[in-house]
């Protein structure tokens, strides 16, 4: 189980049909292919200094069952840094299968909303290895690959699911994701007010200015996708910026 005292910059690798892609606002039709070789992409991020990777099985998220596990296993065997994985994890069997591959932690999204008791049991069975993904739109929790909204507000759901003792909460504003329009600072601040669980930010991070703004919040890290692939953000620069701001906080 990976632990870090520093704020992590986590490159995202979204898998669909065996390729590394990015979706705009989670829409299937708005897909951009960034690599036909996700294993090579994972090695690239490791070589550039990534300490952790965020893998998402988009096919699994849409279909409710992981579809790219052979590829995930291949990635894990070819790199040395830890990875987290999400997408289609709706059963205890699926979670165990993924963890047995060597994934550091798994991300539970839709099923956490549908079955909070199951999440409590899961966190107890695999302490420190269960992350909760909260996908939000206008302050409301989104589920089923971002295709539906539920009745939970982000803050109410976070307060409730925190009782299960997840290792981390990953917050994504889906209206921002893939848009390169900046992160949801206000939503993150609201979330941080109601939970003590470490929070990782995702969605809309488009520039070093965004990285700097997030680095001043009390978060554990940030997941960056499209901006790394397009070159809007250099991984080394983002890591350096977080290190500088962390030093300033302690002075």
Where are these regions (language model features)?
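C-terminal helical cap(s) of enzyme catalytic domains, especially alpha/beta-barrels
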Residues: 118-125, 130, 215-224, 228-251
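Conserved anion-binding
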Residues: 17-29, 96, 103-177
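Glycine-rich, proline-tolerant flexible connector loops at the mouths of alpha/beta enzymes
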Residues: 52-70, 110, 171-181
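Catalytic cores of alpha/beta
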Residues: 79, 83-104, 186-221
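Structural preference for beta-strand elements that scaffold enzyme active sites
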Residues: 8-12, 52, 80-84, 105-107, ...
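Conserved, mostly hydrophobic/aromatic
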Residues: 14, 45, 53, 98, ...
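Glycine/small-residue-rich loop that forms an oxyanion/phosphate-binding "nest" at active or ligand-binding sites
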Residues: 59, 65-124
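Charged helix-capping and loop-helix junction motifs
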Residues: 66-73, 147-156, 181-189
